[in-house]
């Protein structure tokens, strides 16, 4: 910019690399700053049963062909390979991962691999039916999106969600034994910034 001081920073190659080291045959996976990579996020689908205003349009979405979506066998093999170079934590995401058919089967497959942490990010709409089976399958933790505790606002931001269903799902998750559930909230000025105290109180209870 004209008149502004110029700040020159070195260009860092952010490509992952494998360095030789103890612990595995190939050594741990590291990033361009030599930090070990131990955490993997896997998007199971780009499909979702919500249309949150900050995430996607209400209609006209270009979805990936189903043939391009990784099979459970491919996901399992990828996780096994990455565990050999240091990955110990996996989070299943989407889209909305609970709309993926036979999700419980995938969780069972991955839980048998001996990961330190296996978690799932979800909008919570299907937790009433899935919380207990997910826990039994070996899932360790849940991340659940709750942007508001007001039904009118919830419907406004999700365009089709059911707040009562999500809150009931959180109750089911706690009853199933999920004791370290994380609640995610997108802070939006002028929309839900008057609810942060109430959201914290809800999570505390």
PLM feature spans:
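Flexible, acidic/Gly-rich N-terminal and inter-domain linker regions that tether
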Residues: 1-41, 47-51
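Short, flexible segments with low predicted structural confidence
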Residues: 19, 23-25, 50, 54, ...
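Glycine-rich, flexible loop/turn motifs
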Residues: 25, 29, 33, 65-66, ...
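Canonical Radical SAM [4Fe-4S] cluster-binding loop centered on the CxxxCxxC motif
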Residues: 33-73, 84-85
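Radical SAM/AdoMet-radical enzyme domain recognition
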Residues: 72-91, 99-197
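Conserved G/P- and acidic residue-centered "switch" motifs that form tight phosphate/ATP-binding loops
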Residues: 96
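Short, intrinsically disordered, charge-balanced linker/junction segments flanking boundaries
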Residues: 197-205
């Amino acid at each position: 910019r004209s008149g502004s001081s110029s700040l020159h920073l070195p260009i860092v190659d952010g490509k992952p690399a494998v360095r030789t080291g103890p612990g595995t045959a190939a050594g741990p996976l590291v990033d361009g700053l030599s930090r070990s990579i131990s955490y993997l996020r896997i998007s199971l689908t780009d499909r979702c049963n919500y249309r949150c205003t900050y995430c996607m349009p209400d209609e006209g979405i270009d979805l990936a062909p189903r043939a391009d979506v990784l099979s459970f066998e491919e996901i399992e093999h990828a996780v096994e390979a990455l565990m050999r170079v240091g990955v110990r934590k996996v989070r299943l995401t989407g889209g909305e991962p609970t709309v993926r058919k036979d999700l419980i089967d995938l969780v069972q497959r991955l839980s048998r691999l001996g990961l330190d942490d296996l978690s799932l990010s979800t909008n919570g709409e299907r937790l009433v039916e899935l919380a207990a089976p997910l826990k039994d399958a070996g899932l360790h933790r849940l991340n659940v999106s709750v942007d508001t505790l007001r039904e009118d606002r919830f419907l406004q931001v999700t365009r089709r969600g059911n707040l009562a269903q999500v809150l009931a799902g959180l109750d089911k998750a706690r009853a199933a034994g999920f004791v370290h559930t994380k609640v995610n909230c997108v802070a939006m000025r002028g929309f839900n910034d008057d609810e942060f105290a109430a959201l914290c109180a809800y999570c505390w209870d």
